[in-house]
Amino acid sequence: MIKHDSIRLLATNLLKDAIGRAYPDFSASEDDIYKALVNPPKSDLGDLAFGCFILAKALKTAPPQVATAVAAQMKGATAVAAGPYINIRFDEQTHGEQVLATILDGSYFKKPLMEKSPKTMIEYSQPNTHKELHVGHMRNLCLGDAIVRMLRYSGREIVSSTFPGDMGTHVAKCLWYMKKHNQEPVPETEKGEWLGRMYSKANLLLEDQNGTPQEDINRQELTAILHQLEGKTGPYYDLWLETREWSIELMKKVYAWADVTFDEWYFESEMDSPSAAWVKQLYAEGKLEMSQGAIGKDLESEKLGFCMLLKSDGTGLYATKDLLLAKHKFEDVKIEKSVYVVDMRQALHFKQVFRVLEILGFEQAKNCFHLQYNYVELPDGAMSSRKGNIVPLRELVHRMEDHVKTTYLSRYKGEWSEEDVEKIAGQVAKGAIFYGMLRMDTNKKIVFDMNEWLKLDGESGPFVQYSYARISSLGRKFPRTAGAKIDWSRLNHASERQLMQSLGGFNTAVAAAAENFKPSAICTYLYDLAKSFNVFYHECPIGTEADVATREARLALSEAVGLTLKNGLAVLGMPAPEKM
């Protein structure tokens, strides 16, 4: 195992030596000791706690007795036996040399955190073309991007991919409305957003005509459009080619704003015809069944229903394309694991897809994983592009930027350049959105509330960003003396020790979050670190501190917190404003 935590490793070595002195005939495993070290329930008990249970079992001695014997032999740290545990505390100088110094020189953030792992593809952000991108799409984008960043930070080999839906009924509806009913001229700009409005209007019209003779006509017209798209010919196909580019341009603008890039772009249109042909081949080989004119796989015996792959009219479905794409990912990109970041409403879909792949003999099916998450709602309920009750993303960003400029940055008018105001407003808005989308556990629903997410005094992105900006401002106002040796022993205030303990746990927090696909854990870590810094900032004077050595040590501690906040924000895909 990789032992990246220097304080934990030091404790491991000291414990191993102490165990050897207490029990000369017994040799303890370094890995077992390292893994048994935990954070005590209260920070004032110590930096780490070692449970003696496994050791006691091997020695056939009561755990409290082992704890007392080993603690008595500990050197290089303060060790206190507390029942079956040994609470271990290091002095400030050790913390400074082992943790703070490595944070300040940057080496702390370059340590590999995980053993060699399988080459993994993370597929996320699968927006549909011909629909408007809205705030509901952001949970997927933020979650997928954070997972990619966390895993890469930890040392994993990751391939990021996206799979936009540029085919299907939603596209046919939009094109149908444009050709047959739209009276508006196509705008010169923001064509992608305009397409989304066309899609919503199409749905409203179709719903109005349900139950009338026009309903069957509409259905036939939509089917004919889909056949044109699949056949790659006809006026609707030509219109699709043009309008598809408008949507892709909008996606790329959003990704540029979010600072998200993908190693691989897949499109449903690329999988459409080949996947349908493959399904027909599998049916001809007797590997699939027909039910009521549709081709698929009967999974009723496994309580997964009938996995439909070709409808009775010959058109494919999402599952059809996902089957073929899974093969492409493993065979063409040579990945060893495939993760799909898709909301929980698609749980049955992926269970069916993975099971069908397995039945078809695709061995890598066992290495496919659906990372599901709950969806985003507005305070008054769920969003729907079909109904048009959404908050368009670009409109939301502009509103949030205006709020930041009016509420927080207006005081700097005349002092800051317009360029700086715009830049920082954008960074804070982005931080609010990303943190708000990531701070909740993936199984919990998110209710989007712009005002709450933009608060500077709550659990929010702007609060963490503001803490970083405050530290940056402090460093500019009171720069540390270049080359001066820092006396870490000066950091003996309770709030200073709390910060040092927290800083040493950053890599451990990221490694655990990456392993469990839970960026919410990093949000919690950063929020707690920012809170601890603000306590320290108010309790321990810096600029007015008369003792030079103490001031230098506190400035170094502040800088270490700032670097950790900055790296933590980066792991979550969030910017760190230098001033706010």
UniProtKB/Swiss-Prot annotation:
Belongs to the class-I aminoacyl-tRNA synthetase family. The lineage of its organism: Bacteria, Pseudomonadati, Bdellovibrionota, Bdellovibrionia, Bdellovibrionales. GO terms for cellular component: cytoplasm. Monomer. GO terms for biological process: arginyl-tRNA aminoacylation. It comes from Bdellovibrio bacteriovorus (strain ATCC 15356 / DSM 50701 / NCIMB 9529 / HD100). This is Arginine--tRNA ligase. It catalyses: tRNA(Arg) + L-arginine + ATP = L-arginyl-tRNA(Arg) + AMP + diphosphate. One of its GO terms (molecular function) is arginine-tRNA ligase activity. A motif ('HIGH' region) lies at residues 127-137. It is an enzyme of class 6 (ligase). Disulfide bonds: none annotated. It is found in: Cytoplasm. CDD domains: Anticodon_Ia_Arg. Signal peptide: none annotated. It holds the Pfam family tRNA-synt_1d. Keywords: Aminoacyl-tRNA synthetase, ATP-binding, Cytoplasm, Ligase, Nucleotide-binding, Protein biosynthesis. Its EC number is 6.1.1.19.
